[in-house]
């Protein structure tokens, strides 16, 4: 069985390959990436919610590839910012900004707040879609706090700022294996993998 991991983020695809099962029952699963489909064009994330974006990406990728596709949308929700950056997490500092610019904007937005006022969560919505347009959704959440600066060398995006609830480390200070055991993405994709037939 072949399933397309519909993400252009190579680090995310690597993470997903570590999380997802290699077999379902007696079926071996081969996970393909967008690199295996050079003509496939992913849609713009025009949804107003994480759910809408995950569905949009998975359904379109499955339709174009002709095989089942897994996609997700992840957002960082910060309580002191009324849930921002949320669905716009990748574009928080602007449409064409890089992760460092997003991180700096987040730190600036929280300037003056104590650590206890910086509660946040990562939320991932995963979608499994068929070429016919049918889909299933699953959600995963990881709670924590936004620190005062960058810590750690691993991960990507907001990982160097996000202190995991119950730990003294940021996601970027964890090894990939440690992160994959607790992450919001793991929780969502473990749930969605139970729906693969």
UniProtKB/Swiss-Prot annotation:
Binds 1 Mg(2+) ion per subunit. Substrate binds at residues 7-12, 74, 156-159, 179, 184-185. Mg(2+) binds at residues 44, 73. It catalyses: XTP + H2O = XMP + diphosphate + H(+); dITP + H2O = dIMP + diphosphate + H(+); ITP + H2O = IMP + diphosphate + H(+). Keywords: Hydrolase, Magnesium, Metal-binding, Nucleotide metabolism, Nucleotide-binding. Its cofactor is Mg(2+). It comes from the Bacteria. Signal peptide: none annotated. GO terms for cellular component: cytosol. The keyword Metal-binding applies. Belongs to the HAM1 NTPase family. This is dITP/XTP pyrophosphatase. It comes from Elusimicrobium minutum (strain Pei191).
């Amino acid at each position: 069985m072949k399933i397309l991991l519909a993400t252009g983020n190579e680090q995310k695809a690597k993470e997903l390959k570590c999380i997802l099962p290699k077999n379902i029952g007696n079926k071996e699963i081969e996970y393909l990436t967008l690199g295996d489909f050079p003509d496939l064009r992913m849609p713009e994330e025009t949804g107003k919610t994480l759910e809408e974006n995950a569905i949009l990406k998975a359904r379109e990728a499955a339709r174009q590839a002709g095989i089942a596709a897994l996609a997700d949308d992840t957002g960082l929700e910060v309580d002191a910012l009324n849930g921002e950056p949320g669905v716009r997490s990748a574009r928080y500092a602007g449409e064409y900004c890089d992760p460092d610019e997003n991180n700096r904007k987040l730190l600036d937005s929280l300037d003056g707040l104590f650590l206890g006022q910086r509660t946040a969560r990562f939320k991932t919505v995963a979608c499994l879609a068929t070429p016919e347009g049918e889909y299933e959704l699953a959600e995963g959440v990881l709670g924590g706090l936004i620190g005062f600066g960058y810590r750690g060398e691993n991960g990507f995006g907001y990982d160097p700022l996000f202190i995991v609830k119950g730990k003294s480390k940021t996601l970027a200070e964890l090894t990939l294996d440690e992160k994959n055991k607790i992450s919001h993405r793991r929780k969502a994709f473990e749930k969605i993998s139970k729906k693969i037939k």
